[in-house]
Amino acid sequence: MSAEEKNLIEILEEGHKVDVVKYIDYVSAPQAGAIATFSGTTRDMFEGKTVLELRYEAYVPMATRCLSSICTTARSTWDIHKIAVAHRLGPVPVGETSVLIAVSSVHRADGLDACKFLIDELKASVPIWKKEVYTNGEIWKENSEFMEKRLELAEKRDSIVKKTVVEEHRRRGCCGSKVRVEEDEEHKDITGDNKSSS
């Protein structure tokens, strides 16, 4: 059985509830000594506001591809047997499950770590959007994990651009002109010398 055949990824259409037992049964296996799960449910309050329900929308083809990629990364990082990920779309009333992740592994540490990684990455990068519906209004929510991921990616991009500029100047020899670029909290000139320019 290939790694992809050991993943069950479902984006559930409006009106379909998450069947927790189905996904736990899917990941169960004689060689698995642990099954780690995460179940996200709708809570009744947020920052002092009474929540009636959450409503989810998704770009399903891309969400499925993203989840598959996240599962592949988890498999390459931890010793996992099977993974199940299910996410509801449409309204999810208070107390009901909107997302479920189940991971089976030989040992609990791999399953627990992979489960945490999967939910964190789902919230940070999968195109599923949430609207919170309150007694006195509603608002589309942007996950804090998503914002943190965007910031992290921007910082990495800036670091790569800076490094590329420095490497390009070094490669060219830069005709003796002095261009200072910050690099790892040190100031170096374009030739890599630690001389200060005067």
Curated annotation (Swiss-Prot):
EC main class here is transferase
Which GO BP terms apply? Mo-molybdopterin cofactor biosynthetic process
> Is 4Fe-4S included in the keywords of this UniProt record?
no
CDD domains tied to this protein: MoaE (cd00756)
Q: In which pathway does it act?
A: Cofactor biosynthesis; molybdopterin biosynthesis
Q: Which Pfam families match?
A: MoaE
- HAMAP family per the record? MOC2B
Q: What is this protein called?
A: Molybdopterin synthase catalytic subunit
Annotated source species: Arabidopsis thaliana
Q: Which gene encodes it?
A: MOCS2
